């Protein structure tokens, strides 16, 4: 008599071909590269429209509880403070060019 030492195949392994055939017969909806880019662009446009202005984002005054009970006081006020300088803030105007990655930099 033969004895097998391997693990018996799982249900999914036994039905692999059947599952593949069922998948392709179902005619799944696929999106081409051009359509994918169009969908992504329209999503980005919606996100840009939805982004609040700094005033809407960071200058909030409300009654207690309206901001998820962030404070036990009667008013919650958050304001953004700017000094007109971007020094040390991690922001840039896009003029920074990173150095080219070379073997010398890696060593």
Swiss-Prot record:
Quaternary organization: Forms a heterodimer with timeless (TIM); the complex then translocates into the nucleus.
PTM text: Phosphorylated with a circadian rhythmicity, probably by the double-time protein (dbt). Phosphorylation could be implicated in the stability of per monomer and in the formation of heterodimer per-tim.
Top-rank lineage group of the source organism: Eukaryota
Protein name: Period circadian protein
Protein's cellular compartments: Nucleus; Cytoplasm, Perinuclear region
Phosphoprotein recorded as keyword: yes
GO cellular component: nucleus; perinuclear region of cytoplasm
Keyword Transmembrane helix in record: no
Organism, as annotated: Beris vallata (Common orange legionnaire)
Composition skew (Low complexity), residue ranges: 82-95
Keywords: Biological rhythms, Cytoplasm, Nucleus, Phosphoprotein, Repeat
Start and end residues of each stretch annotated as Disordered: 81-107
GO biological process terms held by the UniProt record: rhythmic process
Functional note: Essential for biological clock functions. Determines the period length of circadian and ultradian rhythms; an increase in PER dosage leads to shortened circadian rhythms and a decrease leads to lengthened circadian rhythms. Essential for the circadian rhythmicity of locomotor activity, eclosion behavior, and for the rhythmic component of the male courtship song that originates in the thoracic nervous system. The biological cycle depends on the rhythmic formation and nuclear localization of the TIM-PER complex. Light induces the degradation of TIM, which promotes elimination of PER.
């Amino acid at each position: 008599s033969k004895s097998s030492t391997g693990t018996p195949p799982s249900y999914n392994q036994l039905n692999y071909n059947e599952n593949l055939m069922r998948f392709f017969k179902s005619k799944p909806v696929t999106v081409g590269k051009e359509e994918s880019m169009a969908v992504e662009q329209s999503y980005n446009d919606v996100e840009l429209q939805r982004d609040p202005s700094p005033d809407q984002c960071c200058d909030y005054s409300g009654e207690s509880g309206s901001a998820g009970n962030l404070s036990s006081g009667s008013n919650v006020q958050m304001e953004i403070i700017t000094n007109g300088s971007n020094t040390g803030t991690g922001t840039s105007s896009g003029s920074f060019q990173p150095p080219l990655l070379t073997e010398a930099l890696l060593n």
